[in-house]
Amino acid sequence: MGVIKKPDLTDPVLRAKLAKGMGHHYYGEPAWPNDLLYMFPVCILGTIACNVGLAVLEPSLIGEPANPFATPLEILPEWYFFPVFQILRVVPNKLLGVLLMASVPVGLITVPFIENVNKFQNPFRRPVATTIFLIGTVVAVWLGIGATLPIDTSLTLGLF
């Protein structure tokens, strides 16, 4: 562990270096344009080159071709649509299911207005937003797991 000395701003040599811009970045090389115009494109193009190289040299196999004449008994959407699929599958009225799905973003938009008196960044000092987030996460995971099960055990997840 090293000892860190607080800089003495009354030192005339240090003040002269700071006036020349030789403080934190001692070599005097500015971030603009060197880093932003030269280093970032190199990193971005290098990342793209690595991705293209992996895609060309090691392509992922798609699997067997689909048979249009043989469909599965139950077609499941992608995993990120499981909670929405479960809402539409469980609610008997489709209009009510669509309204339930539309109420989620509307409810999330109203959270800052409910808690506008609280200006803290710490989530433990914003109990309404934290509670809504935790309950929403649990409900979304519950619905997502239930969407993969048969309809008769989907709401209870086979636990009850």
From Swiss-Prot:
- Bilayer-crossing residues are 36-56, 95-115, 131-151
Q: What is its main location?
A: plastid
Q: Classify the protein's membrane topology as the record does.
A: Multi-pass membrane protein
InterPro entries, alphabetized: Cyt_b/b6_C, Cyt_b/b6_C_sf, Cyt_b6/f_cplx_suIV, Cytochrome_b_C_euk/bac
Which locations, inside or outside the cell, does it occupy?
Plastid, Chloroplast thylakoid membrane
Function comment:
Component of the cytochrome b6-f complex, which mediates electron transfer between photosystem II (PSII) and photosystem I (PSI), cyclic electron flow around PSI, and state transitions.
Q: Does the keyword Amino-acid biosynthesis apply?
A: no
| Protein name in UniProt | Cytochrome b6-f complex subunit 4
The protein's UniProt keywords, in alphabetical order, are: Chloroplast, Electron transport, Membrane, Photosynthesis, Plastid, Thylakoid, Transmembrane, Transmembrane helix, Transport
Oligomeric state and interaction partners are given as:
The 4 large subunits of the cytochrome b6-f complex are cytochrome b6, subunit IV (17 kDa polypeptide, petD), cytochrome f and the Rieske protein, while the 4 small subunits are petG, petL, petM and petN. The complex functions as a dimer.
Q: Which family does it belong to?
A: Belongs to the cytochrome b family. PetD subfamily.
Checking SUPFAM superfamilies in the record gives: a domain/subunit of cytochrome bc1 complex (Ubiquinol-cytochrome c reductase)
The molecular function terms in GO held by this entry are:
electron transporter, transferring electrons within cytochrome b6/f complex of photosystem II activity; electron transporter, transferring electrons within the cyclic electron transport pathway of photosynthesis activity; oxidoreductase activity
**In the UniProt record, what gene is named as encoding this protein?**
petD
Record keyword Zinc-finger present: no
Q: What is the lineage of its organism?
A: Eukaryota, Viridiplantae, Streptophyta, Zygnematophyceae, Zygnematophycidae
Q: Name one GO cellular component term.
A: chloroplast thylakoid membrane
Question: Per the UniProt entry, what is one GO biological process?
Answer: photosynthetic electron transport chain
Q: Which domain of life is it from?
A: Eukaryota
